[in-house]
Amino acid sequence: LPFTRLNGGPMDYTPGIFVQDLASVTDGKNTSWVNATIANQLALYVTLYSPLQMAADLPEHYEQFMDAFQFIKDVDIDWIQSKYLLAEPGEYVVIARQGKKDGQWFCGGVTDDHKRTVEVPLQFLDPEKTYEATIYRDAEDAHYKENPQAYVIEKKTVTFHDFLPVTM
């Protein structure tokens, strides 16, 4: 979608699922599974442009992961500009977007079902400034089926000259 439909404009998409086993919320009637990690669900808020955004999971699920839910509260929903930083259609995409609300940058990356690490160039940042990045990422043992709720939140000082290693 980032390479086709979203090139023409926004679309309706509702990310934010934190509890991936739907049987747990349907008394076993729906055995479907959301094939994503929490970090992947957060990245979709940036990579899939939808200016009418919502949180798609149950409130009690967000209460279990309030630190991750903070991203949903903070992320902008409309953008001044968007930059595709790294991409291979059908495999992965990393997009940076500058929010209309306060000019803050958000960067999101998603991959297919193959875990990968990429070096994200930060040349979209102002070369005269230093930034504190809050990074929401998959934990080392995260897996969309076996451990979808394993994530790490870390802070790092970055500049225009840096490359940020991101594992998806």
Feature roles, as predicted:
Residues 54, 59-61, 111, 137:
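A mature extracytoplasmic/lumenal domain signature
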Residues 51-55, 76-79, 100:
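Alpha-helix capping/termination and helix-coil
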Residues 12, 43-48, 95, 106-109, ...:
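Structured core elements
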Residues 69-97:
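Edge strands and adjacent loops of beta-rich recognition modules
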Residues 1-59, 85-87:
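Glycan-recognition surfaces
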